[in-house]
Amino acid sequence: MSSVLFANQRETNLASTVALVEAALAELGHSAPAIRTKDMRALHAWQIPKGSSLTKVTLSHRTDFTYLRVCATVMTLDRAVDRAALFAHLLDLNASLCGVAFATAGDQVLLIAERSTLDLDLSEVLELIRRVTTYADEHDDVLVSRFGGRLGA
């Protein structure tokens, strides 16, 4: 009986989180159906263009609960980039940022915020999306100018 209840709780949480994300996207001026995308690792995904970066909002299954992740591709590295200097700089930036962190995936520099969807509300979804898109837009040109590479993916 408890596994059925747990499954229903997950399904209810997922449905309400999709509604929250789509309400947040609408409030930010985006049509959720128009920016919905496929991501094989996510239950649901949307892509938001802002400036030269592309931000992906995803809902992913984790052992304990579903998680909301907001991830912007800030820049793509090439062979000329001094990775050690860039990575040291990104770590320094991480210490000054609120609620987000720079990360890498292959040759891409990402800016990521993530949290459980448990007790999530609209203001938190809006804040995560705004924070990631704003920080990505503020830092992408500066990072590419200083270290090389190219903007976005």
Give the residues covered by each predicted segment.
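Charge-rich, low-complexity N-terminal segments
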Residues: M1-L54, T104
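Short histidine-centered catalytic/ligand-binding loop motif
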Residues: F6-Q9, C71-T76, D121, V125
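Ordered, soluble secondary-structure elements with a strong preference for glycine-centered loop motifs
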Residues: E11, A15, A80-V81, D119-L126
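Hydrophobic-cavity lipid-handling domains and compact docking modules
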Residues: M40-T76
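Short, internal acidic amphipathic alpha-helical interface segments
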Residues: R69-Q108, I112
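A short, solvent-exposed beta-edge/loop patch
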Residues: A101-T133
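Long, contiguous binding/interaction regions
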Residues: T134-E138
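Short, highly charged C-terminal tails/helix-capping segments
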Residues: L143-A153
